[in-house]
Amino acid sequence: MQKNKEHIVLKYLKGDKVIWGTAFLLATISILVVYSAVSAPAFKFFGGNTEKFLIKHVIFVFAALGAMWVTHMIPYRAYDKLSRGFLFLAIVLLIITLAFGVDIHGARRWLIIPIVNIQFQPSDFAKFALISNLASMLAKRQGKIEDQTLIWQMILWVVVVVGLIAVADFSGAMLLFGTCMVLLYIGRVPLKIFAQIVMGGLAVLSVAFVFGQRGQTAISRVDQWINGVENSNSANIVNSVPDQLQYAYMAIARGGLTGVGPGNSTMRYFLPEAFSDFVFPICIEEYGMILGIVIMIIYLIIMFRGMSIASRSATAFGGLLAIGLSFSLAFQGLVNMAVAVGVLPVTGLPLPFISMGGTSFIFTGMSLGIIISVYRGYSDLADDNIEGNAIKKAEKKNVKVEQ
């Protein structure tokens, strides 16, 4: 019976079991913590009906796992062929969002999907589109990296996509820009060209920082962070940081090593976005620093696993794609945790595959599935080689017997 269950799992969940394991673990943590963290909005809007939020979140969790399964079954080379089309579509969606998107907290980041009436951020799709397109361009011209046409194409795509995202989501644009720089460095882009792309990207980000839809908010957050750092050794540290960080510090302090127990969080009633941007302090408050360390390790595992998969990929595109997606996911997770403990300014970035989310949760699942697809690319090839060698040996034995 046990062997049959294992056979079913191996049959339908192909590829890297480590990535699958981290995804299921993060999804489980997400359901448990979000169910507790949504108490405040549940009482505010639905008379304490937390099940309404839970059901919606669980649906998105399973949708994300489903998207992960679908993308892991698609040969990763297909994304190479579609990457340029994805990029054009992403740019169009970003422009439409800036012009006609839903305005929340002074920024237009969301579009509403007709019929199902679900909001989604085109920037999530744009991140994947840019990463896959850069991986495709670098892979096809590994021997011609200094080609001027390629250089200007890469500069153009990075500047346009990062710039459009930065207008409404500066933190997300910074994260994507950093991921692209890692991808270009690993893709063996010469230092001179690398510096040109960095300067172009920083120039666009600087303009967006000052004149973007959330420019003043970004400046205010940086000022508050600097003020907090300057007063880090004084008794006035609590009053020198934003309210959300004050409550985040309290949540972490209450949690200690082992936490106050599931559902016993107090700071969830005071901490803004306790189920989203600041879900990490709630994780620690209820389950302790032990869970906080476990979550950090999981993101590092995803990053290093992505590097391992990339190093064994049969193609340059597969390797670069795995690195880009795994680094993007891990960077976002580490940045979110760094914000919660005051190491970085407040960003508004959710904790991947843990924060309550809709389509962003699904796009994260898709990214994990594509990483597994790259793993399957060389794993299936190795299996075919083993099978082919076995057939050849059997044929040789049959020839000897007949002789």
Give the residues covered by each predicted segment.
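Alpha-helical transmembrane segments of multi-pass membrane proteins
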Residues: 25-40
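Membrane-helix interface and discontinuous TM-entry motifs in multi-pass inner-membrane proteins
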Residues: 157-171, 251-266
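Hydrophobic alpha-helical transmembrane segments of multi-pass inner membrane proteins, especially
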Residues: 22-24, 28, 45-240, 281-341, ...
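Long extracytoplasmic/lumenal interhelical loops at the membrane interface
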Residues: 256-290
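A juxtamembrane structural motif centered on a specific transmembrane helix
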Residues: 1-13, 334-403
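Glycine/serine-rich anion-binding loops at beta->alpha junctions
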Residues: 116-126, 166-168, 256, 260, ...
